[in-house]
Amino acid sequence: MPEPRGSSPLRVNAAFAARYGRYREREELQRLKDRYGDRHSSSDSSSESDSSDEHVEFDPQQERDFYRTLSLLKKKDPRIYQKDATFYQRTASSSDSEEEPAAEKRKKVQPMYLKDYERKVILEKGGKYVDEENSDGETSNQRLQQSSSKSYVEEQKQLKESFRAFVEDSEDEDSAEEGGSGLLQKRAKSKEEKAQEDADYIEWLKGQKEIQNPDTLKELTHLREFWNNPELDEGERFLRDYILNKRYEEEGEEEDEEEEDEEEERVPGPPVQLAVDDSSDEGELFLKKQEDFELKYNFRFEEPDSASVKTYPRSIASSVRRKDERRKEKREETRERKKREKARKQEELKQLKNLKRKEILAKLERLRQVTGNETLGFEEQDLEGDFDPARHDQLMQKCFGDEYYGAMEEEKPQFEEEEGLEDDWNWDTWAGPEQGGAWSQQEPHCEDPDFNMDADYDPSQPRKKQREAPSLGKKKRKSPFATAVGQEKPVFDPGDKTFEEYLDEYYRLDYEDIIDDLPCRFKYRTVVPCDFGLSTEEILAADDKELNRWCSLKKTCMYRSEQEELQDKRVYSQKARNVWKKQQIFKSLCPEEAEMPTEATGKPQRDRAGSSGQLVAPDGACGKRSQPESTPAEEEADPVTPTEKLAPQRRKRGKKARLLGPTVTLGGREFSRQRLQAFGLNPKRLHFRQLGRQRRKQQGPKSSH
């Protein structure tokens, strides 16, 4: 009977039907478990049904036996043709023993409820609940009674026997296998260690890793070389990847993914309502999926994630926004351009310095040729180093000093008499070869006897030497002096630079850095030499503190103008004339004063001839001694100038002058306090010391009576 036109064929989802069938079976199984309890038989049947869904796990030893057998097959070993050859060495007992713990792992751990605990108490303890603390107390009391009943020797003997029994039990291999407590037992490897060994084994077969102990894998070496051969065909390569990478486990996952994709690709329609028990976990999961599907279908036209505020990172990696780095690129370009210009400027200055050095060396060569001095003081290595002002001045003084410009021969040169030299020739009036005296400075005249009528003649060109007519007699030979005088001399050019100016220009090309196309160099300036009124010996022998009192280090290193330096030089030269003041400051340079301390120090004085214990006058010099009085005859012989006569008179007037204020007596002379303070002494201290000495002198005679 034909189908009506408006009817559509009924489609059934086979995957969904299969899953629903499995779900119904599990639901029925759970209902039976709740009614009759969990039996071993039911657990075995459930484990068998679940094992079909789980992935098959191979034993590692079986995998190694499989790889060893495959290696022998690829190698075509003769053992594969033997009838009694065994390739899988595992026994049934070992397989059963290893399957038992695996089955135990698959079993679920059953929780202990209150009913189970009460049943256990009734069966084991007769329905009596005993606290753990009381039981421990009872056992401790029993142990105490037992230990108290035995002596010390008996206890030691009992301990030794128990230890001996324990050692014998550990040495017995049979007892250890039966469950005895062995002393040393082989440590069982953990799951992580076994998994790491299997992974290393697979990596070794792939050729990606080396194993430290390859002796146990000798039979698999051929299989490893065969699989790592670069000329391996496509089929063998697929088999290698399928086995080593366990592609067979991925097939089940791919099937599940395909089923899910088919469900998503279905035409959306009203969901199929199924009767599901809400108490089951899978039923709840199914209902949740149903609600999610209805929610997505009802709100499919709304904006997704409307309840959440979206935020975006500032820098998006996948953005197509163009970065504007023109300013950065411009700065880098400017920096590179300035660097290139600086390098080019340095190269130009280097070339200019080389040209200047060649010019100076050429001038040195000319000087050697003209002066005849091959060992001139300047060499090429003097121009290679950095500029040193002291070295430069030393070389200039050595090469072009007074000895160079003002050197005169001490003795008149003597030449051997040669034949053909006329004695009556006056060489002092000789003006050089081919020179006509004052007429050479003027232009030639047509009436001159030596006027050249040739139109191509150029008078500016040097004249050729006139050849003397060959004489029939003996040939005349010139003397060395005549040869030296007859050489052509370089004409002095007032516009030419001196050698010192050439060197200054050469060293001026040195620079520290280039800033804005301008070579920056440290400028040296010529300063006025100033010794601050001290000689070299005084500066080296004096103490640092004394030098600082004479002139501070800050003042010596100060940057001053030339006028200020001249003023300081003049002031310190006048200060150095005061020998007494220099003596007071530089006491380390006057050993005589150290031997005879003054009364200001409070120490006993030594009598010195000619001084009579008096303080050295300001006019006295350091280290000078008083001269002995001259005899009347010497006084008459030496005429005395008027200034020398006035000097003693001035001293006498100074003694007769009235001293204002309190005075201090030193060495039989009176000095005012202002005078002593000008000498750098403390007048109050000297005054009180003087009073103390006077008081001691007065008390001395009284104590003697």
From Swiss-Prot:
Q: Where is the composition biased (Acidic residues)?
A: 168-177, 250-265, 416-426
The record's Gene Ontology cellular component field reads: 90S preribosome; nucleolus
One GO biological process from the UniProt record? endonucleolytic cleavage in ITS1 to separate SSU-rRNA from 5.8S rRNA and LSU-rRNA from tricistronic rRNA transcript (SSU-rRNA, 5.8S rRNA, LSU-rRNA)
Name a Pfam family for this protein. Answer: Kri1_C
Region Disordered, as annotated, extends over: 31-63, 83-111, 125-197, 248-283, 305-348, 409-494, 592-705
Q: Where is the composition biased (Basic residues)?
A: 648-658, 684-705
Give residue spans, biased composition: Basic and acidic residues: 31-42, 52-63, 152-167, 321-336
InterPro entries under this entry? Answer: Kri1 (IPR018034), Kri1-like_C (IPR024626)
PTM Phosphothreonine: list the residues: 91
Q: Which UniProt keywords apply?
A: Phosphoprotein
Q: Where is the composition biased (Polar residues)?
A: 137-151
Location of Phosphoserine modifications: 93-95, 97, 135, 140, 162, 170, 175, 279-280, 308, 630
Family of the protein in this entry: Belongs to the KRI1 family.
Q: What is this protein called?
A: Protein KRI1 homolog
The organism encoding this protein is Bos taurus
Name the lineage: Eukaryota, Metazoa, Chordata, Craniata, Vertebrata
Write the gene name: KRI1
